[in-house]
Amino acid sequence: MAGNTIGQLFRVTTFGESHGLALGCIVDGVPPGIPLTEADLQHDLDRRRPGTSRYTTQRREPDQVKILSGVFDGVTTGTSIGLLIENTDQRSQDYSAIKDVFRPGHADYTYEQKYGLRDYRGGGRSSARETAMRVAAGAIAKKYLAEKFGIEIRGCLTQMGDIPLEIKDWQQVERNPFFCPDADKLDALDELMRALKKEGDSIGAKVTVIASGVPAGLGEPVFDRLDADIAHALMSINAVKGVEIGEGFKVVALRGSQNRDEITAQGFQSNHAGGILGGISSGQHIVAHMALKPTSSITVPGRTINRMGEEVEMITKGRHDPCVGIRAVPIAEAMLAIVLMDHLLRHRAQNADVKTEIPRW
């Protein structure tokens, strides 16, 4: 099974299934001499961890990460870093009734068409449980980017259903279970989630992730454009159905005179491009948005077929998130960090000696 690795110089390979013994990943390309402990990774894992609020799945996993290799005396050695998280709260019996049934809106049908079989326990490899390892690997990248280059990566929920959320206060994001930057909308979000729980339904969401302090020059021409790699990374997250960089699809209604980011002696006067021009970072904030579909794991009856092709009605059992966008915030941060780390190392390898007289802001 291919497709388990992302990155060129900073490479992350994950393994494991939702109801397997453990999840793990190998992180290659981490420079030596970086102070690193399990506690450095645990903070973001706790932000993503299931069972931490009444609004998310009640599967209770401690998600305690173990560093198996690549760190000695508290610093990275430059060799492969092995990370492991044990699964401790599997309830595979919740899925025995669907082993011969394809859940609508899930990867059951496509995985069986591709491989001829599937791990039906919680979706197996297709489960978002796999993203715990991305968050752990991303925490390494976030630490390096912040400490060595002053790059800060922050994400938040910017829409749930038909409730838009303004980025009013970044500190507010860590003070509520929704990763919401708009305190005025917390009651509306709570009301929506209560209604969804009562109805047994789910809702979609929009997550925004922003990187500040990114130097100009990251990204490669044509096929490895920085925005293309960011879109690829974010689209690889479970349930993501759309990605925008900067103004995204809003540019359709704009004129060139409105959309271009004019430059004066004081710097850029706007950031409609989301910090990337021609696939290369401009030195402005990198801004990306992703849309997540409403999960299909709901208790509202739905039509599907079984492996014999017979039509059946099913209700999804188990413990699920009514809005998967909530816990996707630290995942989006991690994926953006992984891409930026990779491109920074690639840029340094080729262009470390490049000097220009062009102003930078």
Curated annotation (Swiss-Prot):
One GO process term, biological-process aspect: amino acid biosynthetic process
One of the record's GO molecular function terms: chorismate synthase activity
Cofactor: FMNH2
Catalysed reactions, semicolon-separated: 5-O-(1-carboxyvinyl)-3-phosphoshikimate = chorismate + phosphate
Keywords: Amino-acid biosynthesis, Aromatic amino acid biosynthesis, FAD, Flavoprotein, FMN, Lyase, NADP
Keyword Glycoprotein among UniProt keywords: no
Functional pathway: Metabolic intermediate biosynthesis; chorismate biosynthesis; chorismate from D-erythrose 4-phosphate and phosphoenolpyruvate: step 7/7
Record: residues binding FMN: 125-127, 238-239, 278, 293-297, 319
GO CC terms of this entry: cytosol
InterPro entries, alphabetized: Chorismate_synth (IPR000453), Chorismate_synth_AroC_sf (IPR035904), Chorismate_synthase_CS (IPR020541)
Enzyme Commission no: 4.2.3.5
SUPFAM superfamilies associated with the record: Chorismate synthase, AroC
Cofactor binding comment, as recorded: Reduced FMN (FMNH(2)).
Residues involved in NADP(+) binding: 48, 54
Family assignment from sequence similarity: Belongs to the chorismate synthase family.
Summary of the function given for this chain in its UniProt record: This reaction introduces a second double bond into the aromatic ring system.
Protein name: Chorismate synthase
Source organism of the structure: Salmonella arizonae (strain ATCC BAA-731 / CDC346-86 / RSK2980)
Underlying gene: aroC
